[in-house]
Amino acid sequence: MGWLRRQWWYVTLPRTQPAAADPPASELPEDEQLRVRNVLRRFDTADAAVREEAWKELPPGRPALPFLREAFPETKRMEARISMVYEATFFARVSEDAFQLGLLGCRDRSKHVRDRACGILAYSLRKDALPFLRPLLRADDEVTREAAEGAVDAIKHQNHSLYWGHDALRGQTFWVVNRGDDPWFPDAGRDIDRE
């Protein structure tokens, strides 16, 4: 953690989470919550097969998000944190927990986790993410800088596809996260049912 605290962009990040960052809440019964927390402890490994098996035991869809947000700061393996942030992307527009996980990911020590976290914030299209993204525009590594640039561009123009195609391919790239994101998809008006 010492290296991270010395980075200038980490120091410039806001120290408090937005007011909407209430403690994660879950509708699951107490015994089920305990089981999910134990599964997430096993999830914290570099072994992809073990993570995949643990992932199958988590509740599908939105009910898992409060637990991912709760476990994220204590998760040691970069691979596990990347998986957590990746899964939250699908719910960035409909879940406060997914958005908050994106904000937490922006402070991560791994550039790959920060890249995925910028993707959550870009897909959410929420302007209150901009104060968390702007310091990353001056990050030392190119991956974080480009991800933050794409996310800021996507939010400013309210077009999540600009996150991936914010340079030479502007207007030619579509980032399809859920059904309805692709203008050429026949069922473009319906959202995917991930719950």
Regions found by a protein language model. Give the residues of each.
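Eukaryotic acidic, Ser/Thr-rich intrinsically disordered low-complexity regions
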Residues: R145-E195
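Short inter-helical turns and helix N-cap capping residues of alpha-solenoid HEAT/ARM repeat scaffolds
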Residues: A46-D47, K76-R77, R109-S110, D140-D141
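Conserved hydrophobic register position within alpha-solenoid helical repeats
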Residues: E53-A54, M84, A117, A148
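N-terminal alpha-helical scaffold/docking segments in eukaryotic complex subunits
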Residues: M1-A64, R179-E195
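Amphipathic alpha-helical scaffolding segments comprising HEAT/armadillo-like alpha-solenoid repeats
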Residues: S26-R41, P60-E74, R93-R107, R126-R138, ...
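Residue-level detector of extended alpha-helical repeat arrays and alpha-solenoid scaffolds
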Residues: V50-R51, R81, R114, R145
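Core register positions within helices of long alpha-helical scaffolds
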Residues: E57, E87, I120, A151-A154, ...
